[in-house]
Curated annotation (Swiss-Prot):
Coiled coil: none annotated. This is DNA mismatch repair protein MutS. SMART domains: MUTSac, MUTSd. NCBIfam families: mutS1, PRK05399.1. Belongs to the DNA mismatch repair MutS family. It comes from Alkalilimnicola ehrlichii (strain ATCC BAA-1101 / DSM 17681 / MLHE-1). The keyword Ribosomal protein does not apply. The keyword Signal does not apply. GO terms for biological process: mismatch repair. It comes from the Bacteria. The lineage of its organism: Bacteria, Pseudomonadati, Pseudomonadota, Gammaproteobacteria, Chromatiales. Residues 800-842, 859-878 are annotated as: Disordered. Pfam families: MutS_I, MutS_II, MutS_III, MutS_IV, MutS_V.
Length: 878
């Protein structure tokens, strides 16, 4: 243990013994130990926190003969410090003073009231408003993976059982958990990205029987058959470990966790981890949030809708009934001009989902409740807007919102219009709500009038015009006079405090009043706290319908955002059909188009049973990758319920989206660029089906030309001929354009460019057939490659082209896929005779004789040829 760690506690002060006892219960996390207006940290905790938070590390006297390292943060600013710690993957135990200092003979009684971890945040100040904060747990039971996830700030609880390590990696990439609980005896798959929030838990926390007992107790059921979870032992083991962890950290009931959802792999389009990154759904390839699909689609007006949109984006559905209901709702919002009215009403909605979670945990603040009150007051207007809407989904959501008149009335009676931030100082409960509180407040408030009267009376009685009556928390009420006038005070004044320039006194009458008033104020604050806790308990007992309201409001916001985007960006409703194929008319890349100042060049796509693969050639920067990605994004958008950037889109069933676009070294995993590329390619070849959409860009470029071309050819041939996946295959290997001759399901298309002098113009239009050239040197010039290098490259290119032409004329190295060239034919008799003659030496007579001789030789060869052709025909007929 480090030198700053405490030794045996028997030699410590009583307060430090208390600290060490509590710290021993939480050895692996930071302990915030409440002392007055500060949370203090000691020993190793202090050293770690000082480094992480950049706060002062000092010492607090000695205990057991050694100085005590100490650091602290003020209570009023604790949330900002907690936020910084959890972002760095730290967990913190909050230890509060729960005893009364005035009645404590030893150290004030303290206990840990909650544990803040990266995955269990619920406080508004600690959460990203538009991002879900997920706690996940991973188990392996009977050789099957189980993954459970919980968003504590909403109560959303689910489990799944990934089929293999690739599916597990895809699910973790989708969930992006802030904290992952793992059996400490479990060895994680190599290369699995788990982030900084990895928490190891004892193996017995993942036992199936324990998990089942915990879950049935939480939901008040005999078994878990009603959730469809009874056959998912690995998932249940993870869910049980997760629930136990949340109970330990929150130390309260969890009434907002009401159901467990089982997610099946075939319910959604599978997008593996690499493909999710390549498509830049929420994060771009640099790790930022700009220029992503979410940044274009998210025009939601409240945080609940934004988080729901992102959940949909990360898990596109395959259920056409659900998707068509969403498409119809978006269409009706546009057609009936409901979009703006609905968005205007939703704009003032509070984050009810998270407010209800804090209500359930007993941590809701007064302004949470006024936010809930204002939201409930808007529900009748929302329902009126959607009354008679021509989309069943909109009607259902309006009904799901409800109106909750009793809850609204309760909140209106209980709370003042503008309450303070916290309940601690009172002023939250409205006048008239509770007679006892009103009586105590009246007594307390009348004190002000009494004090003014006392001050005026004492000034007149003593003749001291500057005499004041005041109050502070330490010394209570006092009469204050300047030191120069202290000799004039009456004998019954009892000195209470001496300050620079003033003296403070107390009177028996003022002391009696102080006892009475302070007692009333303390009782009023205590009564108000009790009433507030009763209000929270009342709301918590009826959470289910309010949670349904929150879910409906979030979906309405998301659908209205889809409608707004469709109107603003000229999107169209996609058709989802049973038959195979993908047909997109005048499709555009949603993110690139949104970022351009000028118009985007649209392109068509047709893939069906007869045409399964496009071999895409063309220059760098010509738009090959953009074209491929736009097909994937249009497909994905259609499967979350959004309209799509195209004149029309008709899409058959899609089960997976794969992308093999770009690559870089995996230094941490010890994998080269080519190894990363081949690993991703192998995943596609093992898992793609006839309903998968596959994007392959520049396969084989990470190795030698012949190796790369061979791999690219074999990969494309397998996808087109055997797996028959919908494939867009971009390549710079011109030899690949010969593939359609051998695979009828493949076709060539290209993106062209034109040259104007030294300039190159990319047309970005997809055209039939292969490209004529790659324009690599022109692109290098655009990139700023120095002129001398370009000139040297041109000279080398000319030399290579001349060598290639010579080899075509005199082939001595075969093309990789060409048939062996036949041997050169022997010279004919006429050619042999002609080669032996010098024309300059012939007389006219000799020349005429030679002509007749050549004619005879030629006639004989023609006869031989005719005889050979006749023999061949006879052989075939036999």
């Amino acid at each position: 243990m480090a030198q700053s760690s405490p030794k045996a506690s028997s030699r410590h002060t009583p307060m430090m013994r208390q600290f060490l006892r509590i710290k021993a219960e939480h050895p692996d996390i930071l302990l915030f130990y409440r002392m007055g207006d500060f949370y203090e940290l000691f020993y190793e905790d202090a050293e770690r926190a000082a480094k992480l938070l950049d706060i002062t590390l000092t010492t607090r006297g000695q205990s057991a003969g050694e100085p005590i390292p100490m650091a602290g943060v003020p209570v009023h600013a604790v949330e900002s410090y907690l936020a910084r710690l959890v972002r760095q993957g730290e967990s913190v135990a909050i230890c509060e003073q729960i005893g009364d200092p005035d009645n404590s003979k030893g150290p004030v009684e303290r206990q840990v009231v909650r544990i803040v971890t990266p995955g269990t945040l619920t406080d508004e100040a600690l959460l990203e408003e538009r991002q879900s904060n997920i706690l996940a747990a991973l188990s392996c039971h009977q050789s099957r993976w189980g993954l459970a996830s919980l968003e504590l700030s909403s109560g959303r609880f689910s489990l799944t059982e990934p089929a293999d390590e690739q599916a597990l990696a895809a699910d973790l990439e989708r969930l992006n958990p802030a904290e992952l609980l793992v059996d400490e005896a479990l060895t994680l798959p190599t290369g699995l990205a788990v982030g900084p929030g990895l928490t190891r838990r004892p193996p017995w926390h993942f036992e199936l029987d324990t998990a089942t007992d915990l879950l049935t107790e939480q939901f008040g059921t005999r078994d878990l058959a009603g959730f469809g979870a009874q056959d998912h032992s690995a998932g249940l083991a993870a869910a049980g470990a997760l629930l136990q962890y949340v109970r330990e950290t929150q130390r309260s009931a969890l009434p907002h966790i009401r159901r467990l959802q089982v997610e099946h792999g075939d319910q959604a389009i599978v997008i593996d981890a690499a493909s999710r990154r390549n498509l830049e759904l929420e994060r771009n390839l640099s790790g930022g949030t700009e220029h992503t699909l979410a940044s274009v689609l998210d025009s939601t007006v409240n945080a609940m809708g934004s988080r729901l949109l992102r959940r949909w984006l990360n898990r596109p559905l395959r259920d056409r009934t659900t998707l068509q209901a969403r498409h119809q709702a978006v269409e009706i919002l546009m057609a009936e001009s409901l979009t703006e009215a609905l968005r205007r009403q939703l704009r003032g909605i509070s984050d009810v989902e998270r407010i209800l979670a804090r209500v359930a945990l007993g941590s809701a603040r007064p302004r949470d409740l006024t936010g809930l009150r204002e939201t409930l007051a808007r529900l009748p207007d929302i329902q009126a807007t959607l009354t008679g809407a021509g989309a069943p989904r909109l009607v259902d959501l309006a009904a799901q919102c409800g109106e909750h008149p009793q809850t609204l009335d309760h909140l209106r009676r209980a709370l003042v219009d503008q309450p303070p931030v916290v309940i601690r100082d009172g002023g939250v409960i409205a006048e008239g709500y509770d007679a006892t509180l009103d009586e105590l407040r009246t007594l307390s408030e009348n004190a002000d009038n009494y004090l003014l009267e006392l001050e005026q009376r004492e000034r007149e009685r003593t003749g001291i015009s500057t005499l004041k009556v005041g109050y502070n928390r330490v010394h209570g009420y006092y009469i204050e006079v300047t030191r120069a006038q202290a000799d004039a005070v009456p004998a019954e004044y009892v000195r209470r405090q001496t300050l620079k320039g003033v003296e403070r006194y107390i009177l028996p009458e003022l002391k009696a009043f102080e006892d009475k008033v302070l007692s009333a104020r303390e009782k009023a604050l205590a009564r108000e706290k009790v009433l507030y806790e009763q209000l929270l308990a009342s709301l918590a007992s009826d959470l289910a319908p309010l949670q349904d309201t929150a879910a409906a409001l979030a979906e309405l916001d998301t659908l209205a955002a889809f409608a707004e985007r469709a109107q603003a960006l000229d999107y169209s409703r996609p058709e989802l059909r049973d038959g195979a194929g993908l047909r997109i008319e005048a499709g555009r890349h949603p993110v690139v188009e949104y970022s351009l100042d000028g118009p985007f060049v649209p392109n068509d796509l047709t893939l069906d049973d007869r045409r399964r693969m496009l071999i895409i050639t063309g220059p760098n920067m010509g738009g090959k990758s953009t074209y491929m990605r736009q097909v994937a994004l249009i497909t994905l958008m259609a499967h979350i319920g959004s309209f799509v950037p195209a004149r029309a889109a008709s899409l058959g069933p899609v089960d997976r989206i794969f992308t093999r676009i770009g690559a870089s070294d995996d230094l941490a995993g010890g994998r080269s660029t080519f190894m990363v590329e081949m690993t991703e390619t192998a995943n596609i070849l093992h898992n793609a089906t006839a309903q998968s959409l596959v994007l392959m860009d520049e396969i084989g470029r990470g190795t030698s030309t012949f190796d790369g071309l061979a791999l690219a050819w074999a990969t494309a041939e397998r996808l087109a001929r055997d797996q028959r996946a919908y494939t867009l295959f971009a390549t710079h290997y011109f030899e690949m354009t010969a593939l359609p001759e051998q695979c009828p399901g493949a076709s060539n298309v290209h993106l062209d460019a034109v040259e104007h002098g030294e300039r190159i113009v990319f047309l970005h239009a997809v055209k039939p057939g292969p490209a004529s050239q790659s324009y690599g040197l022109q692109v290098a010039a655009l990139a700023g490659v120095p002129g001398p290098v370009l000139e040297a490259a041109r000279e080398k290119l000319r030399a290579l082209e001349e060598e290639s032409s010579r080899q075509r004329a005199e082939p001595d190295q075969l093309s990789l896929f060409a048939e062996p060239a036949p041997p050169p034919p022997l010279p004919s008799a006429a050619e042999q005779a002609l080669s032996e003659v010098d024309p300059d030496e012939l007389s006219p007579r000799q020349a005429l004789d030679l002509l007749y001789r050549l004619k005879a030789l030629t006639s004989g060869e023609e006869g031989a040829d005719k005889k050979a052709r006749g023999d061949a025909v006879d052989a075939r007929s036999r």
